[in-house]
Curated annotation (Swiss-Prot):
Organism placement in taxonomy: Eukaryota, Metazoa, Chordata, Craniata, Vertebrata
Protein name: Probable ribosome biogenesis protein RLP24
Pfam families xrefs: Ribosomal_L24e (PF01246)
GO molecular function, one term: structural constituent of ribosome
Known role: Involved in the biogenesis of the 60S ribosomal subunit. Ensures the docking of GTPBP4/NOG1 to pre-60S particles.
Gene name as annotated: RSL24D1
An example Gene Ontology biological process: ribosomal large subunit biogenesis
């Protein structure tokens, strides 16, 4: 089963799905849904449409350069069927997919880490500018506790003197 890629959004197209446009020069364009086909007919650039994978890669939101992408290349050379080779290939595909998932997750975390550091710096700057608005929660409590203690001591002394 061959899974094609959408020309516009780079999404997967499974057999029996999507549509195909063949230009006069025999160039084949495959689309996963009518949304992609309409945008193609309007001559929109996939790198400028925010929901496409081309935009995400161009904007640095997704991993673009990695050795694991080499395994996805199309190979049109027929190979004689061998059960051992087939099993090894399937195991290798699973392993490559695991590695790719880990690398993508790490890439996303590194991308988010930069934003968190930037946000932290901005928060510190804002607190320094508006420090007068922040009042320490225990700022007036010390005097209040001291006054209560003095008042209780006086009451105790008054009670002892009364009998």
């Amino acid at each position: 089963m061959r899974i094609e890629k959408c020309y516009f959004c780079s999404g997967p197209i499974y057999p029996g799905h999507g549509m195909m446009f063949v230009r006069n020069d025999c160039k084949v364009f495959r689309f996963c849904k009518s949304k992609c086909h309409k945008n193609f007919k309007k001559r929109r650039n996939p790198r400028k449409v925010r929901w496409t994978k081309a935009f995400r890669k161009a904007a640095g939101k997704e991993l673009t350069v990695d050795n694991s992408f080499e395994f996805e290349k199309r190979r049109n050379e027929p190979i004689k069927y061998q059960r051992e080779l087939w099993n090894k290939t399937i195991d290798a595909m699973k392993r490559v997919e695991e590695i790719k998932q880990k690398r993508q997750a790490k890439f996303i975390m590194n991308r988010l880490k930069k934003n968190k550091e930037l946000q932290k710096v901005q928060d510190i700057k804002e607190v320094k500018q508006n420090i007068h608005l922040i009042r320490a929660p225990l700022a007036g409590k010390g005097k209040q506790l001291e006054e209560k203690m003095v008042q209780q001591l006086q009451e105790d002394v008054d009670m002892e003197d009364a009998p």
